[in-house]
Amino acid sequence: MAGFAGGGGRPTTAGVLPGDGSLVLGTDAPDQVAELFEVAEQLYLEAEQPVSPQGYTIAGAIIVPFDQAGPHPLRGYGLAARSLLAAREYQHQTDYLRQHYERELFPQYVGEAQVIDTPWGRRTTTVWGQGPAWELPYTDYVTFLVGDPPNVSDKFTVPFATVVDVVGILPVAGITPARYRANEWPAPETLATLKAHAIDLPSG
């Protein structure tokens, strides 16, 4: 693809490898990007051997994922593809880990990555509920469920990066895609700090 890099304001080649050996090519021109990602996403979802719905383009002399190619008016398509890819990869991992901990009789919650539509595009979120230890997928947001699972008294959503900074949770070694282990429910003062950073997301 590097041989098709644009220059002088010309559109740059964009390509996607959705799976089953298929390759979708186009450019990052505004009138082509939407269709490129829509076709690639459908092929990815239908593939027997899915690879990725993410587009790749040229940044300088390097082939990079579309969401990491720097400022672009249509970067949102790359972020949406990243969210879908993350959720699908975590889905397989979540199923495996839940079966593993159940088999080992280990009291461990395994958080699930979910895709949500926000006013600023498709993103990922997970839940951290009050109770035993959790392994949280690295999503865009975390929703805290306060109280026993049947009787949640409060819930609020915080950016994942803020949770890492405030609580200090760390990634679990040897797990890909990354998960962060939360051994204890946050103390009341920590929970209050987290809630102060809460944002509004669509419910559903």
Predicted regions and their residues:
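Surface-exposed, low-hydrophobicity interaction/linker segments
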Residues: 1-11
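Short beta-strand
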Residues: 13-17
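Short cationic amphipathic helices and targeting signals
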Residues: 20-26
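C-terminal structured domains
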Residues: 26-204
